């Protein structure tokens, strides 16, 4: 889901759908400057992650924000995305929040640190990652506000931003 959110065109589509759910693929394509085919592909990716849903009216396909079929862990991400886009948070800020969680190893590190604050050495012992890989992922998590270094250990932080906060909660509760 984070990889899908971390894309400027898809965020633009989400924002357009929030503003006017009556637009079809052709309208959305014209609005963001992509071909209808490329726009359709981006919309399908958003549908596949339950961030939007498609509704057919005759031959025309319209999209609305959210999906009644979304699994429970997606609902907070839908709400956070909607809040972020509704208040005009810049796409790059939303993308930065999402990219903290675009790699499974960063998600695992957030979960491990949530159970017990840890040093890099302790994380190496608990995982199948090298110290250099852990350090690289921790740097990204720290830069995006997901972890902090305190008392010689990494601790989970309360990241700023609607999406980062929702992602952190979903990951820790998983």
Model-based region annotation:
Residues 1-53:
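DNA-contacting interfaces and partner/effector-binding or oligomerization modules
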């Amino acid at each position: 889901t984070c990889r899908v959110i971390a894309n400027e065109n898809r965020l633009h589509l989400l924002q357009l759908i929030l503003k006017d759910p009556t637009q079809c693929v052709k309208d959305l394509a014209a609005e963001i400057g992509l071909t209808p085919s490329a726009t359709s592909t981006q919309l399908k990716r958003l549908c596949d992650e339950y961030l939007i849903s498609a509704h057919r009216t005759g031959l025309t396909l319209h999209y609305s924000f959210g999906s009644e079929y979304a699994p429970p862990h997606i609902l907070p991400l839908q709400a956070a995305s909607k809040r972020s886009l509704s208040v005009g948070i810049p796409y790059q800020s939303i993308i930065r929040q999402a990219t903290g969680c675009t790699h499974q190893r960063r998600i695992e590190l957030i979960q491990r640190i949530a159970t017990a604050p840890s040093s890099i050495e302790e994380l190496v012992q608990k995982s199948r990652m090298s110290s250099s890989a852990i350090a690289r992922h921790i740097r990204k998590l720290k830069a995006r506000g997901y972890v902090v270094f305190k008392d010689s250990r990494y601790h989970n932080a309360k990241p700023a931003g609607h999406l980062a906060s929702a992602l952190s909660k979903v990951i820790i509760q998983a």
